[in-house]
Every structure is written in structure tokens, then in C-alpha cells.
Regions:
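Charge-dense, helix-prone N-terminal extensions
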Residues: 1-120
């Protein structure tokens, strides 16, 4: 089976159902409200938001939503990620738990500040 090359977030979402789709939509709506000036796009074949540079990526899985704020976005908040599985560039938000929107907001704001500094 050939892997789909997504061209829009809506097309990406069409491949999901149930709780995963609900959580993807919930995160998308939150990010659109949080950073309305950011462009929604597909990057690395997953949804992303960019403003000057990519701020965050996210992806759906069977048991979690992957959130990818790049390596520095993880490192800066590592001490607050102990309730989640995480790696150098990814955080796993379980489908059966509410999103930590306060933490997501702080990470996105940090990424906004970092990308503005890089582009000056």
C-alpha cells in the first residue's frame, strides 16, 4: 500500500475516525484560536502551523496525539513533561486525557518568540 502524500489538513483528518479524530479537531481548533495569524499547512506529511518558520506539528495515532514543537520546544519545558511520554522532539498526549492547554500555550508562545528572534 502506497503512503498518502497529504496536501491539506482536512485531507489528513479524513484518514482518522473516533477519539483520534475528535482530539485532532480539538487541538486544531485550539491552535487556530491561539495563533490565528499562523498559516496552517502540511509539513513532513502532518499538520503544522507556521509563522516565519514552523512553530509546531501534530499527528494522530491509535492511542495518542503526537505534538512536535521541535527540539528546543521540548528542552525548555522538559521538567513539566513528566506526566507524558516524550522524546527529543515529540510529546505524546494520550487520547483518554484532556489536553494540557496551559502548557501547549506556553510552548507555542516560546516557539513564536524563538522564530521571531531567528528571523531578525
Amino acid at each position: 500500500m502506497e503512503k498518502i502524500k497529504f496536501t491539506s489538513v482536512d485531507q489528513y483528518f479524513e484518514t482518522f475516525e473516533g477519539k483520534t479524530l475528535e482530539k485532532l479537531i480539538e487541538l486544531r481548533n485550539y491552535l487556530k484560536q491561539l495563533i490565528p495569524e499562523a498559516e496552517e499547512c502540511i509539513s513532513y506529511n502532518m499538520p503544522a502551523y507556521k509563522l516565519n518558520a514552523v512553530l509546531v506539528y501534530f499527528a494522530g495515532y491509535k492511542k495518542h496525539i503526537g505534538f512536535y514543537p521541535t527540539g528546543d520546544g521540548i528542552k525548555q519545558f522538559e521538567s513539566r513533561l513528566t506526566d507524558f511520554k516524550y522524546s527529543t522532539g515529540a510529546i505524546q498526549f494520550p487520547l483518554d486525557k484532556p489536553f494540557p492547554f496551559d502548557l501547549i500555550k506556553e510552548i507555542v508562545n516560546y516557539r513564536l518568540a524563538k522564530t521571531q528572534i531567528k528571523n531578525k
